[in-house]
């Protein structure tokens, strides 16, 4: 039987290894490269906009909570990518567009609010036209490739940089569906799903060929819980609402349909590239959890209304959005899930980020990345 001294020695050595491991976790991930839309945009839309026609995210109350000034984020404070950067011990990821003498050594963000996965010309051919931003995923990726000589120098250095980066692919594709729903193309939205997924998959493959080894690919949020959609498709038919959350079930069903198809494609890619970590980010269930039991996680009992908005049961009006004259925001955004009718509050984004980084909302679990670049979870995306 082992002596007490040897057991104590083993325990202390194990504790030391655990402490050292926790302090140095994820050190192999040296930067973040990001693509996407407003969920991930840290200031690109503002950088691309005419100074006389800036988006609302260039003004307060956007940014009031953490930064205490507007940053171009579609939030009152930090967003998911900020919490990921903090977890990895990296600085907040700077926007590429509009940055003058930006330091992109530890990260670069190409995500633009309003961006689509598909080119706008493809959407317009289907009668889907919603002018906001024409910086599609393809354009973001093209810009990234064109900027490589300035970001990393030689082809070898660039391959190393991409290989040691945490690449966040989205969320992207949500606006393709949003814009279709906004112009009443509800019967045609499902036709966009394979097109969007193919575009995302092609971008991942292109980045893998360039040396990419670690990807986070988020799915879509529960659209039926969005104050925008709850206002747009408000109905007296109670059967269309989930009795627990008050969300529109048919829209959430669509989100789940898309997410299942996306996961299937990521599973295919994982088998095709076994040396690459391709992680699915379950934004849907992470956010839905807050709508199911808001008070358990520190949010108010009625989580559907927006913090910043005006009018109606969801504190949201299409013609008077957050940032417009006369539109006020709540006194305590940390108690709200929804920020402006479309995007979430910093508090909700922190919950989602924690669920990705430390909880059950990634497949495979995020912590496998922190054990070294050569270690990969054997958990299947089928589970």
Curated annotation (Swiss-Prot):
Question: Is Signal among this UniProt entry's keywords?
Answer: yes
CDD domains referenced in this protein's UniProt entry, alphabetically: SGNH_plant_lipase_like
Q: What class of enzyme is it?
A: hydrolase
Where found in the cell? Secreted
InterPro entries in the cross-refs: GDSL, SGNH_hydro_sf, SGNH_plant_lipase-like
Glycosylation sites noted in the Swiss-Prot or TrEMBL record: 134, 184, 315
What is the E.C. number?
3.1.1.-
- Give a yes or no for keyword Ligase in this entry: no
Q: What keywords would UniProt list here? A: Glycoprotein, Hydrolase, Lipid degradation, Lipid metabolism, Secreted, Signal
Q: According to the UniProt entry, where is the signal peptide? A: 1-22
Q: Which GO terms describe its biological process?
A: lipid catabolic process
**Which molecular function term from Gene Ontology is one that the record holds?**
hydrolase activity, acting on ester bonds
Q: Which SUPFAM superfamilies match?
A: SGNH hydrolase (SSF52266)
Instruction: List cellular component terms (GO).
Output: extracellular region
UniProt main location, coarse: secreted
State the active site.
38 (nucleophile), 340, 343
Quote the Gene3D superfamilies the UniProt record gives: SGNH hydrolase
Pfam families assigned = Lipase_GDSL
Instruction: State the PANTHER family in the record.
Output: OS05G0506800 PROTEIN (PTHR22835:SF683), ZINC FINGER FYVE DOMAIN CONTAINING PROTEIN (PTHR22835)
Q: Which family does it belong to?
A: Belongs to the 'GDSL' lipolytic enzyme family.
Q: What is this protein called?
A: GDSL esterase/lipase At1g28610
Q: Which organism is it from?
A: Arabidopsis thaliana
Q: What is the lineage of its organism?
A: Eukaryota, Viridiplantae, Streptophyta, Embryophyta, Tracheophyta
